[in-house]
Structure formats: structure tokens, C-alpha cells
């Protein structure tokens, strides 16, 4: 057991709700407002400098035994996941934690995997729109939301993504018994404890 990592593996209050005895993730769709209200609350706090966010995460990753990148600032237009995998000797090119920011300096989301994006709706009419996407694992088309939660929340707040950079932390040597989703959860909770505002506040828990 990694005691330092375990300290940050917990579910933030209100991340889930219960209905008919079952637990569900909070939504950004329909008449669900928990995540939007939380985003609005977070947007009322002062931003934290990118350099400080980097410092917090690098210190934490080193403490749990993950030696990561010296400078995690990447140009999103030039991302090559296979190259990152080879350079940092990752077991899987999805072994990444990444963070994107809004133009006014807020952390938009803490995420994992090889899917950095700056998705955002063009209008509120698109919030609840769905489309069919091919799943290469099931080899079937699946109906899914057109836009992701962080994009919807950022659009609702009247903000825009900063597409000039993204933070990417390659996760080499993930502690035994844990997976990249655990590191994502821990990093999100760490930043919350450090009072770093996160607009898509619950996303790292899903």
C-alpha cells in the first residue's frame, strides 16, 4: 500500500447521487445543476499560477514514486502520444495525467489518457445533443454526448479554452496495485486540498 497515494484516494462530497438504491455520477445535462453550480463557485476564487500547479503535482508524483517530466508544458498542436510513450518508457500511451486551462487561468479539468482536447459547444442548444461514435474495442457504434462535461461547463461560464498549452505528466512506474485512474483521482484531490480552483470539479473522480 502506498500511504501517501492512499491519502488522496477518496470521493469528494456530492460527486454522486443515489436514486432507487443505485449510485449515479452528477451530470451536466438536462436539469442537473450540481456540477454547474460547483463550477460557478470555483470561478469565484482566485486562480493559481500554472507554475505552482506544476510544482504541487511534480512534488506529489515524486513522493509516490513516479519520476515524471521536468517540464510538463506541451504544445497541443504537436502532441505525439507514441513518442511520449517511447521517451518516458510508459507501459501504455494512455498513462498520462493532463490538465487544460481557460484563457483567464482556471484549471478546467484534471484528466487521464491520450485524449487531450479543447472541446466546447458552439451554443447552449448543443449541451444535450448526442451522436454515434465508433468504439474500436467493442467494434460497434455507440451513442454518446456530443460534448464533454468540461467543455459544457466552460461554455456555460462564458469562458474559453487556452489552446496555447496543456500540462502532461507521463506516469512511469505507477505504484504496484494502482492504475492511472487512481493517479488522476489523487492529483485532482491534491489540487483541491491545495485550494486550486477546478471548474469541472468532479471529473477526476469518474
Please identify what each model-predicted range represents:
Residues 110-112:
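Short linear recognition/processing motifs and adjacent strand/loop elements at protein termini
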